[in-house]
């Protein structure tokens, strides 16, 4: 009988669906395991082979955990609001809902064809009113807590998309060729900064890749510093700056304020006012990326004003420059050009003084010196000296002196900014707020607030969304008076901030999640997805989860216990897959050619899951041959009958190979080292074939090991060996520890660390016997002759090393 993968895969997918094989158990008696993919945006281009990698990994773990006795929750859904569907609607007039439904259908068919063991009864869609009712509910709780507010802010405005971008989205859009400018708009903003300290501290409790945790730490950007007041001459006011280096105050030679600083224009003297106004106008057209790039040419304008350095009494010129951001610190800095590279470049360009106040190995007029390891110099006055003190002591001494004088105070700052939450588009969750004629805001009392149908999807030239044109939806009245609904919608990130909770209880119409179900299932045990979401989705979801924790909706302080980032699969040309490069490998194509089991195995065998690796068609053909070998363990002849499996005793060597394989595959699967687990199974299959093994335990154990990886062929062979139930309900094989090691081991013998011989011995041979045998290995004896053995080092079952003199 031939291995006809297409018929076999369709057969078992139908059986799984009909029997509800992967439906999540309702009982809470078993230990739980919640394994989750970052759910996809259903784009029109469909899934390619790179998308399948993470989904395959999570499915292997889901199947493995079921076979180990866990109650597994493994769901799938759709992050379906977003710009692409709206842009397609603008071009074609097709409602985004229709486009989204078609795309979801295509995605679902591909995922089902891969044999992924999702519980499809848990499927969710962020555009479903029954779902976004609760997204809106969370927004209203944020509003009631003072964490959602309206503010006039300079936003990142994309001219082509006619919408606002979050700070975290700007780099990607510029890289894609879009134009992004700064523009003042009244926006909804979420106060994520209120949770900055908790978001930072709780990272230490997570089993996440260190690089992702560090990216979040850097984005939050906690810094300890001092706010220092510089008295402005001729103004009778103070200019407050923030610095993390109060120990360098004696070296401050000028101050710089942001173009948006409330004093910026007021600081300008009559002679400088025109130039200052022009500079401020130009700065407002730039994005933060353009303003803060390390390689950008420094620009600035002198205001004509001076401020007094509280440590030296010297007057310092006050400049305006766009490299200072109003959103960080106080929007004003003291510049110490000798010990800060940006300040040094600015001082050189505008011929400003450079004073050494940290002992430097070179002339600071020739090059900046930024080291904290050196000590202060030239840093004393009649009241204080910090010369010669180490950094921490100098910092504290200076901070205490400033506080005592009333000229400064210690403070903690964050680079993290509040989250601009509004979007000027149609295809998003409506924000459930009503604006009344007297200026008051009230919340919608009935949720969900759904989207009306519109004839045109284009944002207006003024920046308002298409909702502003739907009069019947926009205006209304109630007992509080006439109102106008909010026309901004939520960003795409809103629905993905909490979807992992809804998977637990997707049909609940009365509450976001049942408390008992939440306590059982949370938090997510394994979350698999790309590292590109480190400071977007992952940070936003953690923020919302902490808010829900404070509201007693959830019982855990973090949503995702363990995070794993899969590496990217490149095209065969070693480049990232993209339509523009023409190197995209559609998932449907390889599924039709090689089958789901081959694709699953190949993607996991390519290399370590976390590494970037290229697709190679020759490699998947090799995997197909391996599956053919597995098939022939049960169907040895192409057209013949099944093999007769027996209970004959296996040779000890083969028995040990079987148990070593079970142990290795178990440990590697648990650790997501799928490539080495597959390699170990290949070795076992070769050994079974070489020995002509027909032992039932050996063959069935091999099929059980393969089941999480290649479930369709495993189901078919399990049935062929006489079993009536699904292999998906069978326990994973166990190994006997004593058999999971070699009976005879090879011992390396070294003299002073150099290999001089080897010998074979039974595993577990005592150390004294190993030493005695090693002394008498013929090739070793000549290196010991006439030498004093100073030390004998033994690694059991591996090595004996003689240290001689």
From Swiss-Prot:
Regions that span the bilayer: none
Primary location: cytoplasm
Catalyses which reaction(s): tRNA(Leu) + L-leucine + ATP = L-leucyl-tRNA(Leu) + AMP + diphosphate
GO biological process, one term: leucyl-tRNA aminoacylation
HAMAP family, per database record: Leu_tRNA_synth_B (MF_00049_B)
PANTHER family assigned to the protein according to its UniProt record, in alphabetical order: LEUCINE--TRNA LIGASE, MITOCHONDRIAL (PTHR43740:SF2), LEUCYL-TRNA SYNTHETASE (PTHR43740)
Protein name as catalogued: Leucine--tRNA ligase
